[in-house]
Curated annotation (Swiss-Prot):
PROSITE patterns, sorted: ABC_TRANSPORTER_1 (PS00211), ABC_TRANSPORTER_2 (PS50893), PHNC (PS51249)
Keywords: ATP-binding, Cell membrane, Membrane, Nucleotide-binding, Phosphonate transport, Translocase, Transport
GO MF annotations in UniProt: ABC-type phosphonate transporter activity; ATP binding; ATP hydrolysis activity
Reactions listed under catalytic activity: phosphonate(out) + ATP + H2O = phosphonate(in) + ADP + phosphate + H(+)
PANTHER family xref list: AMINO ACID IMPORT ATP-BINDING PROTEIN, PHOSPHONATES IMPORT ATP-BINDING PROTEIN PHNC
Main localization (coarse): membrane
Record's subcellular location: Cell membrane
Listed name of the protein: Phosphonates import ATP-binding protein PhnC
């Protein structure tokens, strides 16, 4: 379980990124967070693995405080958290296989990984992960030779090879076309269902949130304004999340295109 205890984030300019967040996410959930740009979605997501440090409160993972973790303890906890970015975050000139093997770095010494020395078991796991997202044939291609959708699937394979217990996906389909968007979200959903990996995804599309989530969390101005099951996420609730009915209707139209 992931638990946010009275979590706040204030940026140096005084802007509140998060305002007293109290939230529990159970193991195996597929949670989609929605809200306007600047609502706090990315800040909340990235605070889980401390890519963003919080100003106040505490974040617990399986009963252990990642907020208080340091050194080896922090590295161990981060090893269990896979991160998927909008920009893919791959080493473009490296092969797909090497990018996936980067998910194993936390399990070995710095010297071994710097030299690119991975045991046979890691290679097998990397190949299995690529097969899982239907991109095994690209194992020896350079990452920059792949389409955007293929690169995002490499990111998912990297999280699988990492044997992550939690996957955080920050706007993973924002730059993808509708067909590729479906493929990427289908992969994330199937992995969530097959392996019980807790998955938190930031999305702008209301339609996609309804299609894939088991639970939807709406943020507005750094605060949670909705937290419920998909069937509870009515048009009226989305209007509250996005501020007004006109904004909500516009987003619905974009989502369907």
């Amino acid at each position: 379980m992931i638990e946010f205890r009275n979590v706040s984030k204030v940026y140096p300019n005084g802007t509140k990124g998060l305002n007293h967040i109290n939230l529990k996410i159970q193991k195996g959930e597929f949670v989609v967070m929605v809200g306007l740009s600047g609502a706090g979605k990315s800040t909340l997501l990235r605070s889980v693995n401390r890519l963003h440090e919080i100003t106040e409160g505490e974040i617990m993972i399986e009963g252990e405080s990642i907020t208080a973790a340091k050194g080896k303890g922090l590295r161990r906890m981060r090893r269990d958290i896979g991160m998927i970015f909008q920009s893919f975050n791959l080493v473009k000139r490296s092969t797909v296989l090497k990018n996936v093997l980067a998910g194993r770095v936390g399990y070995h010494s710095t010297l071994r990984t710097t030299l690119g020395i991975f045991p046979k078991e890691d290679l097998e796991l990397a190949f299995q992960s690529l097969k899982r997202v239907n991109i095994l044939e690209k194992a020896y291609a350079r990452a920059d030779e792949l389409s955007g959708g293929q690169q995002q699937r490499v990111s998912i394979a990297r999280a699988l090879a990492q044997e992550a217990k939690i996957i955080l996906a920050d706007e993973p389909v924002a730059s993808l076309d509708p067909l590729t968007t479906k493929q990427v979200l289908d992969d994330l959903k199937k992995i969530n269902e097959d392996f019980g990996i807790t998955t938190i995804v930031n999305l702008h599309s209301i339609d996609l949130a309804r299609q894939y989530a088991t639970r939807i969390i709406g943020l507005h101005a750094g605060e949670i304004v909705f937290d419920g099951l998909v069937e509870e996420a009515t048009d009226e609730k989305f209007a509250e999340i996005y501020g007004d009915v006109a904004q909500k209707s516009e987003l619905l139209e974009v989502a369907v295109k």
